[in-house]
Curated annotation (Swiss-Prot):
Highest taxon of source: Bacteria
Family, similarity comment: Belongs to the UPF0435 family.
Protein name: UPF0435 protein SSP0913
The species this protein was found in: Staphylococcus saprophyticus subsp. saprophyticus (strain ATCC 15305 / DSM 20229 / NCIMB 8711 / NCTC 7292 / S-41)
Pfam families per UniProt: DUF1128
């Protein structure tokens, strides 16, 4: 079953263990490119943990595709 953009963003946010999770608000991605979010989601869910630089790069990538 395909996940919605909101569900994928929430999972990404939870997996990154961000201090300020409100920085990645699912409401800001409603009209974003679903394919880009899906690719980030697949990457994030495939890894057990992230280095601080990886988490920062993922957050930056999400910031660039935010509406």
């Amino acid at each position: 079953m395909a996940k919605s953009i909101e569900q994928m963003i929430e999972e990404i946010r939870d997996r990154l263990n961000l201090v300020n999770q409100s920085l990645i608000d699912p409401d800001n991605y409603k009209s974003a490119d679903e394919q880009e979010i899906r690719e980030i989601h697949e990457y994030v869910t495939s890894k057990a943990s992230f280095t601080p630089s990886e988490a920062s790069a993922i957050a930056d990538a999400l910031g660039q595709i935010r509406k």
